Design a protein with these regions (language model features):
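Conserved beta-strand hairpin/beta-sheet module of binuclear metal-dependent hydrolase folds
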Residues: 15-67, 139-149
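Metallo-beta-lactamase
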Residues: 46, 124, 134-225
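Hydrophobic alpha-helical positions that pack around
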Residues: 130
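Hydrophobic residues at beta-strand termini and immediately following loops
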Residues: 28, 112, 201
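Residue-level signal for inorganic ion chemistry
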Residues: 40, 52, 78, 90, ...
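Hydrophobic residues in well-ordered beta-strands that form the structural core
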Residues: 51, 98-100, 148, 189
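C-terminal regulatory/interaction regions
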Residues: 2-19, 225
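Active-site HxH/HxHxD metal-binding segment of metal-dependent hydrolases
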Residues: 34, 45-48, 55-127, 206-210, ...
Length: 225
């Protein structure tokens, strides 16, 4: 039986303005693999995006309709099937364009590169290319909020033993991109694998072994066990 914390997400999602007064953020727990799909919207302009649509698409679209959002883009944090399986249906239902990293083998309308900035209404999403879990992995940042897909979880990181995975690349993604961000950066991952639904980079630096000070070789050895 699911615990009450997960039940509350199934019934209500997160429906609070976490970023600033004009922006809506919804973290939606979907499917049997504990995936998170995100709906983010400019409340004033009534436009938004969806990150990683997979299952429970009626639930996702209910959130969109309830907030009267015109979904402009679908972002994929990487090309694994459990983060992209809902792309086609959501695109058909909303007319949204699919955005993924330029190296992603999946069908996309727009190819994103490192440091690209995509504007949706007043919202500006910055793309960080963060290979390691997957060659085409990206993180998306708006204000102090970072959507990490399977690159970084609460309390852990994405596995690197799947096709396209590389512990060396993941180490570099952490060292050169994520660890350079402010400690107050809020982490929203691609799965509900941690003890908490979301975290901060400062907290993860202290408690997540993946971000502990260590050499690249030490990190590779840990990830290869």
């Amino acid at each position: 039986m699911q615990d009450s914390r997960i039940k509350s997400f199934l019934n209500r999602i997160i429906s609070a303005s976490y970023l600033h007064s004009a922006v809506l953020l919804f973290q939606i727990l979907v499917g049997n693999l504990k995936n998170f799909t995100y709906v983010i919207g400019d409340e004033a302009a009534k436009v938004g995006i969806i990150i990683d649509p997979s299952w429970d698409l009626d639930k996702v679209m209910s959130t969109v309709r309830r907030n009267k959002l015109d979904v402009k883009y679908i972002f994929n944090t990487h090309s694994h099937w459990d983060h992209t399986i809902g792309n086609k249906e959501i695109a058909n239902r909303t007319g949204a364009k699919i955005i993924a990293h330029e190296s992603a083998p999946t069908l996309k309308d727009i190819s994103a590169r490192d440091n690209d900035v995509i504007e949706v209404g007043s919202l500006k999403f910055k793309v960080f290319h963060t290979p390691g879990h997957c060659l085409d992995s990206i993180c998306l940042m708006i204000d102090e909020f970072l959507f990490t897909g399977d690159t970084l979880f609460v309390g852990d990181c994405g596995r690197t033993d799947l096709p396209g995975g590389s512990p060396a690349q993941l180490y570099d993604s952490f060292a050169e991109k994520i660890l350079k961000l402010d400690d107050h950066t809020r982490i929203y991952a691609g799965h509900d694998y941690g003890a908490r639904l979301r975290s901060t980079l400062g907290y993860e630096k202290k408690h997540n072994r993946s971000l502990q000070p260590q050499s690249k070789q030490e990190f590779i050895e840990i990830m290869s066990r």
